């Protein structure tokens, strides 16, 4: 047996160098799907203040009708309610030293940019999702044959199942009776957690049919009963209900949530301090999201949230 050994540094181990792989691996990211459904607010922008006001007009106070020849035409009115969208600063940063940048075997700024981009996408999509989910009209999947609805901002029952085709029909039909307008493709949309739609895949139309409808949404998994379904894993819970096994979902039509942008999200490189030794990279945005219709004040909604006590 030889006397020079790899296992002992002084006898051979010092003759080798470990190598660092140049392939950097990152943690898997959530699927962020809500922001693509926000409508841009053209009144927002730079030098226009941090808030956009928007008016909502009611129907006429009393409907018109037939007239007697000698009567005057009745005089009615409508009411105006006003909503607002507030833009807020968002951001995060990672500082680093010139020394680590200079001596590292991989590109420190590039890894920082990737980590910040991932954070930026999660944060902004969650901000958009909050506006979709903060809603007065709630549907609870009591079981696969029964859907319980509440309109005061809280679920009225505990979920006992994930959505079935029957529950979807209940929700879509309720959206129609609530006069929720369909989106520009003449369909409703649903962003759903993984558990909430696991029972629907047998009912989705063939994907080949979907391609004839135009571009698919990011994360779109199927269509059923006039509603297009998108799966997300960033914001909605998969642990609702009595057994903690059931998922949340959000159904919506047109004009649900608006997005106002003064400064779109961007990566910024900080000005070095301490004679170049103190450096940093950040992401920053000045923008905001706002649900348009509030059932408690407007008497209408554009969103139904699937949730549970």
Stretches with model-predicted labels:
Residues 2-37, 81, 150-174, 199-309:
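Sequence/fold signature of self-assembling virion shell proteins
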Residues 54, 114, 118, 187-190, ...:
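Hydrophobic alpha-helical segments involved in membrane association or supramolecular assembly
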Residues 56, 192-194, 231:
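Flexible glycine-/small-residue-rich
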Residues 58, 98, 285-289:
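Beta-strand elements of well-folded, non-transmembrane domains
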Residues 42-46, 177-184, 189, 219-221, ...:
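A general structural signal for short secondary-structure junctions and capping/turn motifs
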Residues 48, 81-108, 171-202, 207:
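Structured, hydrophobic secondary-structure cores that serve as assembly/anchoring elements
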Residues 100-178, 305-309:
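Alpha-helical scaffold segments that mediate packing/assembly in large oligomeric complexes
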Residues 30-92:
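Assembly/oligomerization interface modules of large self-assembling protein complexes
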């Amino acid at each position: 047996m030889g006397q020079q050994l790899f296992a002992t540094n002084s006898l051979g181990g010092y003759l080798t160098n470990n190598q660092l792989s140049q392939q950097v691996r990152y943690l898997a990211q959530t699927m962020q799907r809500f922001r693509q459904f926000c409508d841009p607010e053209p009144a927002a922008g730079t030098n226009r203040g941090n808030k956009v006001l928007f008016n909502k007009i009611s129907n006429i106070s009393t409907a018109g009708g037939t007239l007697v020849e000698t009567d005057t035409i009745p005089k009615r009115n409508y009411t105006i309610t006003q909503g607002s969208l507030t833009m807020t600063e968002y951001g995060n940063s990672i500082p680093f030293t010139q020394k680590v940048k200079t001596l590292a075997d991989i590109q420190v700024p590039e890894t920082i940019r990737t980590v910040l981009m991932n954070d930026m996408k999660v944060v902004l999509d969650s901000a958009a999702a909050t506006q979709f989910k903060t809603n007065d009209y709630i549907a609870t999947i009591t079981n696969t044959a029964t859907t319980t609805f509440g309109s005061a901002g809280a679920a009225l029952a505990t979920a006992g199942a994930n959505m079935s085709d029957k529950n979807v029909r209940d929700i879509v039909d309720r959206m129609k009776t609530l006069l929720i307008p369909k989106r520009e493709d003449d369909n409703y949309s649903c962003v759903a957690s993984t558990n909430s739609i696991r029972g629907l895949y047998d009912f989705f139309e063939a994907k080949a049919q979907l391609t004839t409808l135009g571009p698919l949404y990011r994360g779109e998994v199927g269509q059923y009963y006039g509603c297009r379904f998108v799966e997300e894993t960033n914001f909605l819970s998969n642990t609702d209900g009595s057994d903690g096994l059931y998922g949340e979902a959000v159904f919506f039509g047109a004009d649900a949530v608006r997005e106002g942008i003064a400064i779109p999200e961007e990566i910024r490189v900080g000005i070095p301090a301490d004679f170049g030794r103190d450096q940093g990279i950040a992401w920053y945005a000045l923008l905001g999201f706002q649900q348009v219709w509030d059932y408690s004040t407007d008497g209408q909604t554009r969103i139904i949230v699937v949730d549970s006590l």
